[in-house]
Amino acid sequence: MTFGLRVLGSYLGLAIITAVVGFGVRALSLGLDIGIIQAVAAHRDATVTSIAEIVTYAGSFPILAPIAVAVVLLRRWNRPADDIALVVIAAGSAALPWLVKLIVARPRPSLEQLQHLSSLSFPSEHTTQAAAIYLTIAIVLSKELGRGLRELVIGLAVVIAVVVAWSRVYLGVHYPTDVAAGLLLGWSWALLVFHWARPSLEPAS
């Protein structure tokens, strides 16, 4: 199977699975989601709010796309298969949540928002992008490192994505289930493309 078909299969498969989960979430989890948002809002602090407003930009595509491009350029096309995979993962991390949002059509939380957004909510686009792109960059850049350092770099990428997810809930623009789905979707997309689709680009040994 070619790289393109594997990417397409991963994209459609994850979109369908996430959409099905999204319909279940809409039907079953609203009370829990609202309870968590209200609990978070009740303990907001001005300093933490300022941090959340900054941290949340780490999941913004206008920030992440140049970072991904810079990684590719700095590597000087050293490993073309890795670089192509990074570009595809970055693009897909924006396109996947967009498609699922259209299908599930879950409105944003209507209370406790610190940033007022009117777009759809499930899954969190910022979280999906952060999960997919930071993990892929970490995998690509840590290939030549020892096991301990490699695990540290990948762990840092995971932490960044989780912090972005937290910021979206803290700011009241996403339900907790939106960001949980975003994390799982982003990581799944990155791992499928990198470890299943990318090897088909490698020269035959």
Regions found by a protein language model. Give the residues of each.
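N-terminal transmembrane-helix/juxtamembrane module of multi-pass inner/ER membrane proteins
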Residues: 1-63, 102-114
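Interfacial segments of alpha-helical transmembrane regions
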Residues: 4-13, 68-94
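Hydrophobic alpha-helical transmembrane segments
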Residues: 8-12, 56-75, 83-88, 133-134, 141, 151-158, ...
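Aromatic-anchored segments of alpha-helical transmembrane domains
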Residues: 19-20, 91-99, 159-169
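Membrane-helix interface segments
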Residues: 47-48, 78-83, 110, 147-152
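Membrane-embedded catalytic cores of phosphoryl/pyrophosphoryl-handling enzymes
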Residues: 68, 112-205
